[in-house]
Structure formats: C-alpha cells, structure tokens
Amino acid sequence: MANCENNPWKKNAWGKNEETAEEPIVSFADVLSEEFIEDLSVQEKLEEERYMKQLDQMFGDTSVSDDQLPINTEGMTDEEVALALQRHFDREADVARAVGSSSSVHFTPDRYHPKTMQETDSENEDDDALRQAATDMLYAKLDEENATNSRLRPEGPSTSRTKHDTGVSGRRNADKTFNDRNTLPTGDMVGDKLNNKVFNKLMAFGKSESKRQMRNKDKEEKATMDTSVDSDTRLLLLKWINQGVFDSVDGIIATGKESAVLHAAQDSATSYAIKVYKTTLSEFKNRSEYVKDDFRFKNPRGVLKIWAEREFMNLSRMAKHGLPCPQPVKVRRNVLVMSFLGDQGLAAPRLKNVEWEFFTDDERRNVYDQVQSIMCRMYKECLLVHADLSEFNLLLTPDNKVHVIDVSQAMDLSHPRSLQFLTRDIQNIITFFTRIGTPNLPTYVQLFNLITDLDMVEDHDLLVQVEQFSEENRSVDLRHDKSRPADMELKKYNEEKKANRGISPAREYN
C-alpha cells in the first residue's frame, strides 16, 4: 500500500486520487423505452439548474470589471478555477442566446473566435498601388512608341517600328534560320540579318531536301540500295568468316540492277564471289515479267530470298551438266556464295568490256561458238532459258573461255513465255557479235531452229511465229499453269528442291 501511495503515476494531476465512476447497469429494454429517456432529460435539466443556482449565489448581481476575475480563486485548485470559468462563459452564452432568440440576427461572443480568423488574406494595399502604377507607366510608354492613331502620335518624325521593318524582319529571319533543323547548317548567326528573299529560298530548299531524303524506300538498317550490304548482311558475312567459309571480304567487284558482287578470299589461292541481292528493286523495273502473279514475290525480303535460292538451284543444275558457270557454294537469305571467275583477285571481264579490236576473226568466231553452245546446252540438257542473256552476263577468262553468269531469272521450259524470252536472248547475242564484226553469223530464225529443233520460216518475223506457235501448241497443263502461275511455280520449285537433295533412305517417304 505504501508503494501505491508514493507512486506519482497513481495520483491525479490536480493532487487528488482518481475515483472510478461506476455507471449504473441499465437493461436494453429500459434504453429503448421513452419514459427512461424522458427521465434522463429531466435529470440533466435539474443538474443544469443546480449549477446555475450555485453560480448565482457565488457571483450575485455584481458586475465584474475587465481587470478582475469573475470568481474568487483563493483556496481553489487550477481544475476548480477552470471549471468555474467555463460555467461562467456557458452562462453568458446561454443568456445571449436567450435574448436573441426572438431576433433574426444572432450574436456570438468574440472571445471564442481564434486570432487567425480575424486576419485577412488580401495583399498589402501599398503593394497593389505600386504594382498598378508600374503597369500604367509601362503601357503608357508602349502607347507612345507604337501608337497608330494620329491623335496619339507624338509630334515630330515617327520612330515607331512594325514587324515589316527591315531590321526587325532580318533579325527574326536569322533567328528562325538558326533554330530551324530543316535548313542548312548555319553555325553562329548571332547579330546577323537575313532579308526575306534569302530566307524564303532557304526555307524552300530545306523543305525540298527533307522530302527528297524521305523518298528512300527503306530505312538505312534495311535498305541495300548502293552497296547491298546492310546490317543483317554484314552479320551474316561475319558469321561465315567465323565458320571458316572464307577469311576476309575485300571489296565490291560489280554492281547491277538487282544485286552487288563482293570479293572474298580464303587464302592466297582460293577466292569466292559473294552475290548480295538488293532489298529494294527500284532499278529492276520489269521484274514483274519474270515473277508475275507469283505468291512468293509479295514481301521484298521474301522476294530476294527466293531470288537468291533460285539462282543457287539454277547454277546447281548447270554445274551438274558441266556448263561453264560459277560453282555454287552456299546460300542464305539474300546472299549467295559461289566460286570466283578471275585471276589473282581480278574478276574476268565481261564481253562488253573486252577490247575486240585486238582479236582476230577466228578468235571472235570461237567466242561466238562457245556462247551458241551454252545456249543450246541450257535449253536441251538443263531445260532452262537464260531470259536475260547479253554481253553483260558473259565473262571471258584469260584462257579465252566463256562463262555464263546471272542466272537468277533463268526459267524452266514449262514457263508460258519461255520461247519469247529465248527469242530475245537470240536477238541480243546476234546483235552484239554483229557489232564487233564476227563473220558468218546465222540469222535469228536459224539460231532459234538450231536451239529448239523447231522449223520456223525464215521469211516471216520470228517473234510473231513464236507467239503463234505457243498459242497453238499449248497443252492442257500449260493452260492450267497459266491460269494458276503460283501453283505451277510452287510445283516446279518443290520438284527441283527434291531433285537436288542427296540420296536418303527416307526420300521416298518425304
């Protein structure tokens, strides 16, 4: 017990022990009854009246000045003083509320308002006056300089400037040119001026230059317009170098309308030609003649993938029959690796670039006989038509041996227009060798009959006869293939792919 009495935490702040008030136990039915509620309200009123009578006895009717407290605090604790003051304030509020109950205006004692409520958020009147005066002076000055009304214009010569002033417009044009990205790089133009004529020309040139740059078909990482080597192609070449297919890629041998040829070396004695097909065939205007209505030629990169694989298959067929052509090595997407035709890293010249004035008639005739043999063997043994044979696609090696290249567009004899393309090849070859002075050349019809073993009339136009022959001798399968060229090309593609595969026990079941 002594410990409990000496414990400061067990005492009240006012020096008295706390006595727990025991609340009376009331049933739930009594709480809901109206009589019980009325009794509680009556008891509260009686207690309030008792407190009011005590206050009246304590203070009486004497008035209290502002310097005096309303109660005698002698012998009272702080809690008793606070309670007495609170009851006094409550009584004053009740009296004021009772007096003003009959009026529509209610008065509340100011002593209950905090000081923050009496302050305002408005700005200082002096600051507002100064700000307004400064604003008026600024507008008055602007009105004097830029007044357009004659009544407001000051006397004497005019000093106002408009946006059409030479100096103002010159500085504005220089600033626009300096900050415009579409025009040429200008460097530091601080303090310079440009007249309207020069500025308009620069802006027009900048717009035309930006439009010209946007006319490129593909982006830089996808397009192969110039060198045919984009990021994907470079990555593929690097992978082949790591695999040991070749050691280095030296440079460009030649460029054409659909591809570019690069030189690759494995050692001092072995070289390869890498043919990279362009992903944009803007220069190959008549490509549709070769691949019209073919489902494989919708996507540009899909086109070049099939185009490279098609040349690989044609070269494989020609090499299988022993025709003079590059030996195919590897193909992937739009990149084809084949043997290099040339000597000591120098590519063999095309017939177009050969200096024929140093050749004799017999040597020229020998070159023609080789070309004629290539055309006949391609038609009869390989069942192919070059479809783009000319002096640009024939190479002459140092030992005067002719090799045929660029057979990506070569087509099978089942193609509906194979004879028409053969006729064009014959015309190109005869025209070229006639121009270089080759003796004893056959006519178009004679060479056509020699290659195809047909009997065309010499006196009539060869192309007309070929078209008529194609119409009259086309079989039912050819008519069906012409109406569905995609199905025909897919069938031939699968047959060639199956024929070029090696011997396998599962070949009959695939």
Swiss-Prot record:
The organism's place on the tree of life at top rank: Eukaryota
Tissues expressing the protein: Expressed in tail neurons (PVQ and PHAL/PQR).
Enzyme class, broadest EC rank: transferase
Family matches, as Gene3D superfamilies: Phosphorylase Kinase, domain 1, Transferase(Phosphotransferase) domain 1
Pfam families reported for this sequence: RIO1 (PF01163)
Keyword tags: ATP-binding, Kinase, Magnesium, Metal-binding, Nucleotide-binding, Serine/threonine-protein kinase, Transferase
Cofactor(s) annotated in UniProt: Mg(2+)
GO cellular component: cytosol; preribosome, small subunit precursor
EC number, UniProt record: 2.7.11.1
Molecular function terms from GO: ATP binding; metal ion binding; protein serine kinase activity; protein serine/threonine kinase activity
Binding site for ATP: 241-249, 275
Record note on disruption phenotype: RNAi-mediated knockdown causes no obvious phenotype.
Ranges for domain Protein kinase: 235-510
CDD domains in the cross-refs: RIO1_like (cd05145)
Compositionally biased region (Basic and acidic residues): 108-118, 162-179, 474-499
One biological process term in Gene Ontology: maturation of SSU-rRNA
Region (Disordered): 100-126, 143-191, 474-510
Residue numbers annotated as active site: 388
Transmembrane domains' residue ranges: none
Catalyzed chemical reaction(s): L-seryl-[protein] + ATP = O-phospho-L-seryl-[protein] + ADP + H(+); L-threonyl-[protein] + ATP = O-phospho-L-threonyl-[protein] + ADP + H(+)
Family recorded in the similarity comment: Belongs to the protein kinase superfamily. RIO-type Ser/Thr kinase family.
UniProt protein name: Serine/threonine-protein kinase RIO3
Organism of this sequence: Caenorhabditis elegans
Lineage summary: Eukaryota, Metazoa, Ecdysozoa, Nematoda, Chromadorea
